[in-house]
């Protein structure tokens, strides 16, 4: 993957657009009719999007308007995918994130330890948790897990949509589960304090990964199959097992929250959040938008490029059903998406303590249990 591909990839880290066309930033739009009590709660809360991209272009220095939008979003930290199918590309992506933080020390920090999340909130910076979704470069040499842990990558996904040496992804019809290499990788990640992410894994791989891990695991960005049956969504038995083992489930802001041709809305997303709370309990659910902080806007040229990328992904066998739909939830598309969700949770009768947990406290808790709280 070249530098252009990385910039395209970070624009929309969703399954629908891992290499999507360039998106445009727009000014922050305030949530409509956010009650003052919710606005105050949000301002004081630890807010973590468990899969999100910070900027539209890692090679172009962010403008003052872009940095203002990031700050005004109120988001404390994000889990940010930096992996590439190749070893060299992944190292280059890590260097790009390091450069972004070095060049904008007042706006960003890399979360290398659990206490850095609170530090990001205290210093009004966006904390970036570098993570992997691809595993090909690890398959060549699983010992690289430790090397990348030393580079600050402390969240790693075992599979993408297809099969890896570690297990089957969600699009594999055989649903073969974890391999011996996958079991060994989980043990190594547990020993190193690296979070295991099973978002794109098949049902059996996910279930076995939860059971094999000595520490809680993440499903950082997914949906509830009981609400809408889709390969990227997880059934209730997996959600229950995840919670029983102390894990975390992040609901994404993707079209896979509802059947086509219905346009997804915040109501559909909240249906998934509430269902997950009912199954998992209030201590295990959050938001992993699978989007970006900045507002996504596609012009005609970008839509054409998006279509080409969908065709490419389908040809490679990694495209999920329904990827050709709008790759975001229109009324949760922007820097304010987490605050809007907070207001929607309040409308559904959730108390302040639960809203704070969903906004970020649950993710913060599980990262502390996996990494240690130093």
Regions found by a protein language model. Give the residues of each.
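Active-site core of metal-dependent hydrolases
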Residues: 167-261
């Amino acid at each position: 993957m070249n530098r252009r591909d990385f910039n395209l990839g970070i624009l929309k880290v969703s399954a629908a657009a891992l290499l999507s066309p360039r998106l445009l930033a727009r000014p922050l739009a305030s949530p409509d009719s956010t009650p003052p009590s919710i606005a105050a709660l949000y301002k004081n809360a630890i807010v973590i999007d468990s899969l999100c991209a910070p900027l539209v272009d890692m090679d172009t220095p962010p403008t003052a308007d872009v940095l203002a939008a990031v700050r005004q979003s109120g988001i404390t930290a994000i889990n940010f995918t930096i992996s590439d199918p190749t070893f060299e590309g992944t190292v280059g992506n890590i260097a790009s994130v390091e450069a972004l933080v070095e060049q904008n020390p007042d706006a960003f920090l890399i979360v290398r330890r659990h206490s850095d999340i609170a530090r990001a909130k205290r210093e009004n910076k966006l904390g970036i948790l570098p993570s992997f979704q691809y595993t090909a470069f690890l398959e060549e040499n699983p010992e690289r897990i430790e090397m990348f842990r030393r580079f600050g990558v402390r969240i790693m996904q075992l599979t993408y949509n297809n099969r890896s040496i570690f297990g089957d992804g969600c699009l594999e019809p055989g649903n073969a589960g974890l391999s011996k290499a996958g079991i060994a990788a989980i043990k190594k990640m547990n020993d190193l304090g690296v979070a295991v992410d099973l978002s794109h894994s098949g049902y059996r791989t996910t279930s076995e990964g939860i059971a094999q891990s000595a520490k809680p695991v993440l499903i950082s960005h997914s949906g509830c199959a009981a609400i809408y049956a889709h390969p990227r969504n997880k059934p209730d038995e997996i959600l229950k097992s995840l919670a029983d083992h102390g894990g975390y489930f992040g609901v994404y802001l993707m079209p896979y929250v509802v059947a086509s041709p219905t346009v997804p809305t915040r109501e559909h997303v909240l249906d998934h959040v509430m269902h997950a709370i009912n199954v998992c309990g209030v201590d295990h659910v959050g938001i992993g938008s699978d989007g970006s902080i900045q507002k996504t806007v596609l012009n005609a040229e970008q839509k054409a490029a998006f279509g080409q990328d969908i065709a490419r992904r389908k040809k490679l066998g990694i495209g999920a059903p329904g990827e050709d739909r709008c790759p975001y939830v229109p009324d949760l598309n922007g820097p304010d998406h987490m605050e809007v969700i907070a207001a929607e949770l309040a409308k559904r009768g959730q108390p302040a303590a639960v809203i704070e947990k969903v906004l970020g406290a649950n993710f913060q808790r599980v990262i502390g249990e996996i990494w240690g709280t130093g």
